[in-house]
């Protein structure tokens, strides 16, 4: 610790920080353009100049380390004049197009010029202009506005690991670009827009739509992957009304215009993936609407609470009254919260059935204890890793922020990452050993010389993908992983060395609720179609393989409960439900933390939540006794369940049990776990922006994933 004097005030700071960080810790604001706390120091904008006693000229505070008994001044006439001169220099070639710039109202250059700049300009020469670059469907460039802060270059090389952006030219001919014409191909490209302090990089889907002061902001949780980052959803009220018989029935709900990252407590990063940021426009395309005339009339006459009862009557009437029975099943897609899964499970249980699962294939995983279906550590604790073994997992596309954190820790500490599985460019320095189970078995038997010392490392860990537990030989893979886990845990009683990564929230919520599909057996894969369902519910399903669910001999009444319509699915009836932006709810993330979803936008259609639909359906079945109070008690039950999970011991030796395998232990290759990052759920499949990203950024693969 060092003692400093800042503006005649004595403070104590750490010896490892810069002058700028010391000033901020003391509460003094220092303007900057190039400096960012998550990036390396560049020091080329010169906006953060401060005066230091006994220094002949102003000092760049972001690049100057603190020293003992240093005396710093941030508001002297010398500092003010220097900042004014720097701003005048930066504005020499900057265009005067603030009225049409999407950055207007949120522009750092506007704010700094107002606070520290001059009220007049003295430049009368020709301004230079720079040709705009084509970076893809996400980023719109107006390069004449660029002030060469190099934030975008440092982000792409340090955070993403993509060495495509750089600066070239000298003096007034300096430009930032991709050297040769190319798109910025990364799943984190939208963060470049947030980093740009001026309007040089703006969001192409958001272009010319609104101004920042017109937006209403709400905080919620991202639900497109298992990390569940904190996000800020910006909406705008619509002035259009729905009119019927010269009466205003309802005001059209809010419209989502933009999603930005909030401060993430998990990884302490302010990044989100492009799918989390831009997939919301899928709710505008092929959105299901509830055109129940009788229901709308009841809303006007009885009010919103009583309309739920009439909702059940109308639903029953609209879908010709399917009778629920023991032969009732449900398949849940990747975007379903705890309430939806909980009430779907209760619904199937009341019907007397057991057939409920996520996707077309059942996972061969043990849901009895948190240790077997959780990451078993926080993302922030990744800095304690020495060696990480990644088994059949594409961290870049299954958990983008997890991959970013792994890269950051590798850059800072020179970590070793070992991958076994389908090769993919994770933007990590990795040793890829092979693509089959043979490699994993050899490693578990200590037959790989390269990894002989892995068991002797202080803290080796294993991450593997939930998706690989759903393939035909998932049970065999679980056996090998459990054998390897038992070997690694021989000398340390900790559960942090073995973790499973879920790519979607539905599988996490299933696991935490302890819901297991069908018979408790790993052999339960293809027998489900012999059930001959009378009624089958598809909940937010992005894919449905009828040959795995339905018997050709028997007709099944199929009902799709979804926010959007997928033309490739086969169903008898479509029932609209609310999206997770339009309701309050709960979900678990990969750390096992219970997160709360907040309603940030109202539904444009008359859709209700999934649990309301199922409750209404049960309400009007003659053979079942169901009360509406069960819905309102859900929050208490979930809180109790989460508290129970915390009390379960995370590690026990006798839980390393092995599955019985009907087939011989033969080698099989790891299939790619993500076929298309941009089109991976029912909302993104309907997103125009995600469709363009998939067209420009994805590569075709002939690898058969259905094995």
Where are the language model's segments positioned?
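Non-catalytic alpha/beta scaffold blocks inside enzyme catalytic domains
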Residues: 360-646, 706-707
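Acidic/polar active-site rim loop that often engages polyanionic ligands
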Residues: 64-72, 594
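Glycine-rich N-terminal segment of FAD-binding domains in flavoprotein oxidoreductases
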Residues: 28
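N-terminal export/assembly segments and adjacent metallocofactor-ligating motifs
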Residues: 1-24, 32, 36, 51-55, ...
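N-terminal single-stranded DNA-binding subdomain of primase/primase-helicase replication proteins
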Residues: 45-65
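Acidic, Ser/Thr-rich low-complexity intrinsically disordered segments
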Residues: 646-676
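AMP-binding (ANL) adenylation modules
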Residues: 39-40
